[in-house]
Amino acid sequence: MSDQEFDLSKIRNIGIMAHIDAGKTTTTERILYYAGRTHKIGEVHEGGATMDWMEQEQERGITITSAATTVFWLDCKINIIDTPGHVDFTIEVERSLRVLDGAVAVFDAVSGVEPQSETVWRQANKYGVPRIAFVNKMDRMGANYFAAVESMKEKLGANAIPVHCPIGAESQFVGMVDLISQKALYFLDETLGAKWEEREIPEDLKEKCAELRYALLEELATVDEGNEAFMMKVLEDPDSITEEEIHQVMRKGVIENKINPVLCGTAFKNKGVQQLLNVIVKWLPSPKDRGIIHGINLKNNEEVHLEPRKDGPLAALAFKIMTDPYVGRITFIRIYSGTLKKGSAILNSTKDKKERISRLLEMHANERTDRDEFTVGDIGACVGLKYSVTGDTLCDDNQEIVLERIEIPEPVIDMAIEPKSKGDREKLAQALNALSEEDPTFRVTSNEETGQTIISGMGELHLDILRDRMIREFKVEANVGKPQVSYKETITKNGSSETKYVKQSGGRGQYAHVCLEIEPNEPGKGNEVVSKIVGGVIPREYIPAVMKGVEEGLNTGVLAGYGLVDVKVSIVFGSYHEVDSSEMAFKICGSMAVKEACRKAAPVILEPIMKVAVTTPEDHLGDVIGDLNRRRGKILGQESSRSMAQVNAEVPLSEMFGYTTSLRSLTSGRATSTMEPAFFAKVPQKIQEEIVKK
């Protein structure tokens, strides 16, 4: 085996993902501690967690940005990304999962699967990321490992298989039986759970563990269908199966996404974290196991298949931008093929711009170490890239490849923002520009009619935190308006326009003539502008100007000035004047033409619909459902467990402002709710008329 193959098989790129407060960051902190990366364990509730390095995170005790770090365990190098669990920061989860090879999903032993766990799980399904699960907080009142496993099967459709059987629960949780080695692991309290001893399985658990182990083996046999020898052993002599054989089949099942093994522990009390580290190495895939990478060759538009090789052509994905007061702009990248050296010149193939790398950094939360090169499988950061943003591909000059992009959701909430003093105007513009580069779900636009600057994001907390960062990092004070719904506009039928822009005011005039056809695009696909000009009726050098004009025209809608989405525009015909035509004339004409076409294409206003989950005592269930119905909500279903009910609904965001407060008074403070963007839908006609009047 060559050095390169050996190295690659020893790398694990993993994410730690979960619902807010399931104990994700604490689990990561313990991993860093045991793998010798930190000498003192950081506690989230003390504001000392290494991975939560932004001041806002330490104050609020939640994780906002995905911090990246590298640790070593059992001769493997593990790159870990700790992702946020709060729904306003889903882009952080989305972009992390896009570059990971495997993930650990952390669940709370009391709550099991919570709404945000479902979102994160769906995102991981989309990118086909293999997962193992860790049921955390086994020492809490009401902890129930097997109920958590069942909720994973029911709510996530996961093939969740217990590999542990807890010994005791709540304050009596002392260890677990490892169903693979058939040993009971007891944590030694005087070592704070850092050490344990192996003993025989307790008498009262022997029968249950034997059943669980047989169920595990049966499941593995069905997952690895082609392995007849394993199947025969399970049927005829399950006790003869070795640990090694089980690990091999388990690894194959996890990598193929057919099985999700579930471990248990309590990270805060240090129980079960080393066992988790062992299986991260044993079961989760290396970059080599994820196999061939698919991209598009820009020269001939054909699909390219790249093997993860050190000496292959360079293909890397920028998945996060960070601004550092000392170093400047830092771009986080994942290398899928080839090697990237410090000082090298590369191509951003998404933007067709040349870039130069001045420094390469290995990150540990916000500490950094300089490196001379990164190679296939590495996750690291580079300094010196000017144009690259989230989702861009970096490659060799002569190998123009574009990798699959990261899906970026549309923002759902708007706020007007202005500097407190005239002197802050420039600083505010710089801050907004830097923050929108870092976070693709944060948009900055200006309202043409009022001249106001509008910031848009994924929720109130999202915009709150960005405002905090402006004050702290950019020293800029700003006034913000009340949160407003971020409406969009779209068209519902085909339309066309023929527009001439002619100006004659002595001397050289202006002339442009553009014909467009527009049609609705698939929901969520965004706007597309294509040129179908043939025979040079509009010269080639003017076509980019027409496209730019069309794109700018789509930024403000024709009903109420909200941006148009999901519109497909084709430039089909036009004409020009030898002397009077210019790029400016064609740009203005493109913008006018698309507006005219949209007016004829039955435009409508869209509003963000939120997926809402309310957990309430059953005696308040009727009130909660009635209230959601009054808010134009559509009830999707409800489920009950232990005198509590969970109601799932889809409700327009415009009806949900201040919902937490009214839910509290409706249920005497006993109900809780979560909310996340689901999709955009057409606004009812009556409400559309009110919005247009405003």
Swiss-Prot record:
<dbReference type="InterPro" id="IPR027417">
    <property type="entry name" value="P-loop_NTPase"/>
</dbReference>
<dbReference type="GO" id="GO:0005525">
    <property type="term" value="F:GTP binding"/>
</dbReference>
<dbReference type="Pfam" id="PF00679">
    <property type="entry name" value="EFG_C"/>
</dbReference>
<dbReference type="InterPro" id="IPR004161">
    <property type="entry name" value="EFTu-like_2"/>
</dbReference>
<keyword id="KW-0963">Cytoplasm</keyword>
<dbReference type="InterPro" id="IPR014721">
    <property type="entry name" value="Ribsml_uS5_D2-typ_fold_subgr"/>
</dbReference>
<dbReference type="InterPro" id="IPR005517">
    <property type="entry name" value="Transl_elong_EFG/EF2_IV"/>
</dbReference>
<dbReference type="InterPro" id="IPR005225">
    <property type="entry name" value="Small_GTP-bd"/>
</dbReference>
<dbReference type="Pfam" id="PF03764">
    <property type="entry name" value="EFG_IV"/>
</dbReference>
<dbReference type="InterPro" id="IPR004540">
    <property type="entry name" value="Transl_elong_EFG/EF2"/>
</dbReference>
<dbReference type="InterPro" id="IPR035647">
    <property type="entry name" value="EFG_III/V"/>
</dbReference>
<dbReference type="Pfam" id="PF14492">
    <property type="entry name" value="EFG_III"/>
</dbReference>
<dbReference type="Pfam" id="PF00009">
    <property type="entry name" value="GTP_EFTU"/>
</dbReference>
<dbReference type="InterPro" id="IPR047872">
    <property type="entry name" value="EFG_IV"/>
</dbReference>
<dbReference type="InterPro" id="IPR031157">
    <property type="entry name" value="G_TR_CS"/>
</dbReference>
<feature type="binding site">
    <location>
        <begin position="136"/>
        <end position="139"/>
    </location>
    <ligand>
        <name>GTP</name>
    </ligand>
</feature>
<dbReference type="InterPro" id="IPR000640">
    <property type="entry name" value="EFG_V-like"/>
</dbReference>
<dbReference type="InterPro" id="IPR009022">
    <property type="entry name" value="EFG_III"/>
</dbReference>
<keyword id="KW-0547">Nucleotide-binding</keyword>
<keyword id="KW-0648">Protein biosynthesis</keyword>
<dbReference type="Pfam" id="PF03144">
    <property type="entry name" value="GTP_EFTU_D2"/>
</dbReference>
<keyword id="KW-0342">GTP-binding</keyword>
<feature type="binding site">
    <location>
        <begin position="18"/>
        <end position="25"/>
    </location>
    <ligand>
        <name>GTP</name>
    </ligand>
</feature>
<comment type="function">
    <text>Catalyzes the GTP-dependent ribosomal translocation step during translation elongation. During this step, the ribosome changes from the pre-translocational (PRE) to the post-translocational (POST) state as the newly formed A-site-bound peptidyl-tRNA and P-site-bound deacylated tRNA move to the P and E sites, respectively. Catalyzes the coordinated movement of the two tRNA molecules, the mRNA and conformational changes in the ribosome.</text>
</comment>
<feature type="binding site">
    <location>
        <begin position="82"/>
        <end position="86"/>
    </location>
    <ligand>
        <name>GTP</name>
    </ligand>
</feature>
<dbReference type="GO" id="GO:0032790">
    <property type="term" value="P:ribosome disassembly"/>
</dbReference>
<dbReference type="InterPro" id="IPR035649">
    <property type="entry name" value="EFG_V"/>
</dbReference>
<comment type="similarity">
    <text>Belongs to the TRAFAC class translation factor GTPase superfamily. Classic translation factor GTPase family. EF-G/EF-2 subfamily.</text>
</comment>
<dbReference type="InterPro" id="IPR020568">
    <property type="entry name" value="Ribosomal_Su5_D2-typ_SF"/>
</dbReference>
<dbReference type="GO" id="GO:0005737">
    <property type="term" value="C:cytoplasm"/>
</dbReference>
<feature type="domain" description="tr-type G">
    <location>
        <begin position="9"/>
        <end position="288"/>
    </location>
</feature>
<keyword id="KW-0251">Elongation factor</keyword>
<dbReference type="InterPro" id="IPR009000">
    <property type="entry name" value="Transl_B-barrel_sf"/>
</dbReference>
<dbReference type="InterPro" id="IPR000795">
    <property type="entry name" value="T_Tr_GTP-bd_dom"/>
</dbReference>
<protein>
    <recommendedName>
        <fullName>Elongation factor G</fullName>
    </recommendedName>
</protein>
<dbReference type="GO" id="GO:0003924">
    <property type="term" value="F:GTPase activity"/>
</dbReference>
<dbReference type="GO" id="GO:0003746">
    <property type="term" value="F:translation elongation factor activity"/>
</dbReference>
<dbReference type="InterPro" id="IPR041095">
    <property type="entry name" value="EFG_II"/>
</dbReference>
